[in-house]
Amino acid sequence: MAALKLLSSGLRLGASARSSRGALHKGCVCYFSVSTRHHTKFYTDPVEAVKDIPNGATLLVGGFGLCGIPENLIGALLKTGVKDLTAVSNNAGVDNFGLGLLLRSKQIKRMISSYVGENAEFERQFLSGELEVELTPQGTLAERIRAGGAGVPAFYTSTGYGTLVQEGGSPIKYNKDGSVAIASKPREVREFNGQHFILEEAITGDFALVKAWKADRAGNVIFRKSARNFNLPMCKAAGTTVVEVEEIVDIGSFAPEDIHIPKIYVHRLIKGEKYEKRIERLSLRKEGDGKGKSGKPGGDVRERIIKRAALEFEDGMYANLGIGIPLLASNFISPNMTVHLQSENGVLGLGPYPLKDEADADLINAGKETVTVLPGASFFSSDESFAMIRGGHVNLTMLGAMQVSKYGDLANWMIPGKMVKGMGGAMDLVSSSKTKVVVTMEHSAKGNAHKIMEKCTLPLTGKQCVNRIITEKGVFDVDKKNGLTLIELWEGLTVDDIKKSTGCDFAVSPNLMPMQQIST
């Protein structure tokens, strides 16, 4: 009772001191603030919630693919007709949904994103000079937003060193004739403990448009499954944060320790009128199929690579797998082995594809495919995910490539002026020296063009980052100083065959063995 009286007294004292703007009484150590300066404002009409967004504003727009996007708020912007927007978002949805709608209506002037993906209109506008696009590594984008919300003006990261991100010159805007009108600027470089890092500046927005699952009437917010992604850091990095939710509950419905975003970051709240929650890539398994498939292996060549790649897994390992061959290799993980699969959109403990009635729009992998999770799995935000990746907590990264150099340089994200998919999370995934990087790819491109080369001719994803190359013809180990060593060779091929199809010289291991295949 004495403690309650003291608390009550402190509250009165705090209120009195604040209202009079005077000093606290001598001898008082602290007081409880009861300021009413900021309250979350609730809306019923999404247009009302965004109508004051002016032309030329910078918007932070949450979501990953179509998962966790603020559908109702994007629809409201279509109605207000606001123009010349700078949209900061991991990607731009698809042609006819998500931010793709604002691209089609020509309301966006510049995108700051990591991935163009399958949005053909996004790519068309960029390559034709209609849209400015600042492509940024996914983890760097997440950290720039996190830093902006935390009041950190800039930070150093190893991601992007030795690439166009560091060197500058990456096209931001094309002229109609295909020449570069605006190019990215070089980054400052510093060395710490013998490793190179580049300086990245924080990102803040005028407004953040965020999708969450539930909010209470105080303004506290929680997310659902992998729909957390970029939504969480964006909540904290804007002058005005507008959150749309599926349900609003009474104060006290959430345990304090379960709240993902405290009310201090939330300025406006609205319950979305309706949600389509479209699934970009519905991937399913059938009853009795323990893993499920993301497409077919694609014949002997791909299956050969997949079955060799599966031997890279070790019990207890944390691994991040790219779409295509790397992800298909996970189908061959032994049931006697535990491999923890991490997905950069915020999942640790990926399981098989869902049955038809298990598919969930709020649970996808980095390839935007529907997935399930295993017991012991966890969900987290994009900035947290890339802290795991950049910090070297992931043991293995397996991904595809367009080109790999003799000394382990990797190129897999763009063909200037022709094809721009964006680097996504790849630059971050290969940035940690603590993580083993394995490239899986066909040995040659169309027309038997070399993919393993003396020097990459395409823009780099990472410099001297690849540790091993697996193709249908053999396996190479990569040394940053000494180059390639052929350690495994497919049955029926000779070393001379490999020399003819490889665009650089390589050593041959004295212990050269037949190319291994996992038993099935």
From Swiss-Prot:
Residues 1-39 form a transit peptide. It catalyses: a 3-oxo acid + succinyl-CoA = a 3-oxoacyl-CoA + succinate; acetoacetate + succinyl-CoA = acetoacetyl-CoA + succinate. This is Succinyl-CoA:3-ketoacid coenzyme A transferase 1, mitochondrial. Pathway: Ketone metabolism; succinyl-CoA degradation; acetoacetyl-CoA from succinyl-CoA: step 1/1. Key enzyme for ketone body catabolism. Catalyzes the first, rate-limiting step of ketone body utilization in extrahepatic tissues, by transferring coenzyme A (CoA) from a donor thiolester species (succinyl-CoA) to an acceptor carboxylate (acetoacetate), and produces acetoacetyl-CoA. Acetoacetyl-CoA is further metabolized by acetoacetyl-CoA thiolase into two acetyl-CoA molecules which enter the citric acid cycle for energy production. It comes from Mus musculus (Mouse). It comes from the Eukaryota. It holds the Pfam family CoA_trans. Keywords: Lipid metabolism, Mitochondrion, Phosphoprotein, Transferase, Transit peptide. It is found in: Mitochondrion. GO terms for cellular component: mitochondrion.
